[in-house]
UniProtKB/Swiss-Prot annotation:
The organism of origin for this protein: Homo sapiens
Keyword Phosphoprotein part of the UniProt annotation: yes
Positions bearing Phosphoserine: S173
Region (Disordered): 133-247, 292-320
Biased composition range(s): Low complexity: 158-173
Principal location class: membrane
One Gene Ontology molecular-function label: ubiquitin protein ligase binding
Name this polypeptide is given: WW domain binding protein 1-like
Regions that span the bilayer: 42-62
BP terms from Gene Ontology: CXCL12-activated CXCR4 signaling pathway; hemopoiesis; positive regulation of protein ubiquitination
Gene expressing this chain: WBP1L
Lipid bilayer topology: Single-pass membrane protein
Length: 342
């Protein structure tokens, strides 16, 4: 074949073995004593093709890697563009989503910076008592005999006179300011003016005739407990006749104590509470037993201890004195043993 012939068609002198020369009429020198007429018979022919094939493979691999990298970048760019359009182009929403307002979910920064909402009240029973029962129980004015007027005014101030002005959504864990911060004469002047209106407004929802005498006894007993057992302005959180027990959901279940009362009075009070609150009233079974650190201090004293106290005759208590004040968790049991009745 003419295209496989050598480039040189003239005679060529070749050097063979032992420096012997020979002449090739056609083709070119090949080997020791041969004349080659085709290129595939040369050794460098295959070397050149091998190098060409290796370089071609390298170029193909590099091209494929570059192509894959470019496609990945293009896909990521398309994904980012789609996400950006979905987040900022509200017209691309489906038809049934276009009429929804944009303020259904607040921004993340607003949720993080907003203060936490207050927890719910301890129980629905306590919230209903704040709305239905009178804010305080007791006569319109005056204090029982044998009580210091200064302490009596502080006790009157410690009673929930400011409860009508409180918001119903205020969490019960927030304690009221200390009554020692306010002047004594101001509390003494405010007590006679505010007590009748609060008592009449609260008793108008239930039965005024049934609670009138019981409220007077409850108020008198409360002032005696404040002056004898507590003897300090911080005793506003002490409410006799109320026990607390922890329920497991970080709340305190408040129940009413039944101690030494007649059956007819208890039935009458229970009937009134059931009619007002549409549910049975939970009375404590452990009122006569005082577990350490689980009930308010000085609330469940035995009748013998109360009889031995000088100047404090035993008075029949109503079935319950429902003054819903916040429980002070920081009171220690040693604070009551150090105070003595005046």
């Amino acid at each position: 074949m003419p295209f496989l012939l050598g480039l040189r068609q003239d005679k060529e002198a070749c050097v063979g073995t032992n420096n012997q020369s020979y002449i090739c009429d056609t083709g070119h020198c090949c080997g020791q004593s041969q004349c080659c007429n085709y290129y595939y018979e040369l050794w460098w022919f295959w070397l050149v093709w091998t190098i060409i094939i290796i370089l071609s493979c390298c170029c193909v691999c590099h091209h494929r890697r570059a192509k894959h990298r470019l496609q990945a970048q293009q896909r990521q760019h398309e994904i980012n563009l789609i996400a950006y359009r979905e987040a900022h182009n509200y017209s691309a929403l489906p038809f049934y989503f276009r009429f929804l307002p944009n303020y259904l979910l607040p921004p993340y920064e607003e949720v993080v910076n907003r203060p936490p909402t207050p927890p719910p009240p301890y129980s629905a029973f306590q919230l209903q008592q704040q709305q239905l029962l009178p804010p305080q129980c007791g006569p319109a004015g005056g204090s029982p005999p044998g009580i210091d007027p200064t302490r009596g005014s502080q006790g009157a101030q410690s009673s929930p006179l400011s409860e009508p002005s409180r918001s119903s959504t205020r969490p019960p864990s927030i304690a009221d300011p200390d009554p020692s911060d306010l002047p004594v004469d101001r509390a003494a002047t405010k007590a006679p003016g505010m007590e009748p209106s609060g008592s009449v407004a609260g008793l108008g929802e239930l039965d005024p005739g049934a609670f009138l005498d019981k409220d007077a006894e409850c108020r008198e007993e409360l002032l005696k407990d404040d002056s004898s057992e507590h003897g300090a302005p911080d005793s506003k959180e002490k409410t006799p006749g109320r026990h607390r027990r922890f329920t497991g959901d970080s709340g305190i279940e408040v129940c009413v104590c039944n101690r030494g009362h007649h059956d007819d009075d208890l039935k009458e009070f229970n009937t009134l509470i059931d009619d007002a609150l549409d549910g049975p009233l939970d009375f404590c079974d452990s009122c006569h037993v005082r577990p350490p650190g689980d009930e308010e201090e000085g609330l469940c004293q035995s009748s013998e201890e109360q009889a031995r106290e000088p100047g404090h005759p035993h008075l029949p208590r109503p079935p319950a004195c429902l003054l819903l004040n916040t429980i002070n968790e920081q009171d220690s049991p040693n604070s009551q043993s150090s105070s003595s009745p005046s």
